[in-house]
Structures are given as C-alpha cells and as structure tokens.
C-alpha cells in the first residue's frame, strides 16, 4: 500500500511531492481507518521511512530515526490463523478501560505517565496484573532505546529485552500460542539472542534476533513447524530513476 500510494502520487496528472510521513499517514488511513479495522500505524511508517524508528502517536505523531546496525532477524510464520479481535480486546480495549477506571483516583493518568506510584486501590488483581504489564513494557522500551542509541550496541542485551517483552505478551497479555512458544524455544536453543511473537499475536508470526549463525536458527524454526525468512533493515519507499 505504501509503495502504491507513492507511485500514484507521482503518476497523477498533477504529481504531488509528499514526504515519507505523509505517505505513511495516507497508507494508514487507507488500510485501517477507511475500513474501520483495528491496528496500529507502525507498519506503514516503518515501510515508508525505512530503517529502525521509534514512533510516538500521542499527543501527535513523533518519529525518531534509530541508526542502529543490528544484523539479521529471522521471521517465522507459524501458519496459524490469528484471532485479531480477541487479542485486541485484551491488549487494547481492556487497557483503555483500565485507564478510564484509574482516572477517578489519578487525574490525568495516561499510558505515558503511568507508574507503580499511582493509586491502584480500585483495581482487581487481574487489572493490576495488566497495569503492571503495561509499565513493564514501557520500561523495556526505554531500556531498548538507550541501548540502540549507543555507539557500540550490546546485541545480547537487545535479545534479552526481546525475551522480556515476549514474557509480558505471553504471560500477562496472553497472546502467544503453543506453536509460537515451540518455535521461539527452538530459535533460542539454536543460538538466537532473543525473540518474540510478532504483531497482534494469537497466531501468525514470531521473529528471532540472530546476528550470528542465522541459517542455523532458521533451520531450527523450520524443524519446529514454521516457515522462515531471513530479514534485515532496509530503506523505505523511493522512486528509482
């Protein structure tokens, strides 16, 4: 969709010179908003801009380019269908309701400001677990940003942070599957530094971070029943002349 929009913008009777952020915005509107479909905007912005990015969507779109050289990832397709609506209810809708509930005792609280210091007395145990999982994910993100912006990245730390993030997705948000777990375990045993389920979860794909011996890790994921693709960071959409 991103490349198609870029192409059409140049082939129009009156071509427009949209920047990469504008192309990403239109792709997101076409894929999600137009059809009232759930989902984030990271795919469209990453595809358009290229490389590694950090995207903040609130209060407005803010994008930070990350010039990290991480090497090879292996995308593993479990071939399992995804139950996106069920997953998003747990991951998105439930957490939005959680923030509304917390607002009563914690005026102004949001996903960016939430911490363990807020008043949680009106939450039940399941809601508290979901809340602390949200905080943990935020902490993992901040640790990863610090590491990725270093001149010399510790690739094993990046792998460990991916594992930590997956633990939250599996144990608290409950979006992993038995097959995905088997594929991740096989990847780690074969030498991957880390990995996690990809996208909304509930099936679909996982990825493993394996800058060393990626072919060995890919073979292990195949043996666990997945289809594999070796992937690297690349440039975004562009017009070749």
Predicted regions located by residue number:
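Broad gene-expression machinery/nucleic-acid interaction feature
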Residues: 41, 73, 205
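C-terminal nucleotide
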Residues: 25, 46, 54-194, 208-241
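Short Gly/Ser/Thr- and Asp/Glu-enriched loop/turn motifs at secondary-structure junctions
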Residues: 199-203
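Short alpha-helical patches at coil-to-helix transitions and adjacent helical residues
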Residues: 1-2, 20, 39, 177
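DPxDG-like acidic metal-binding loop motif
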Residues: 1-15
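Alpha/beta catalytic cores of group-transfer enzymes, especially the acyltransferase/condensing modules
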Residues: 12-67, 195-198
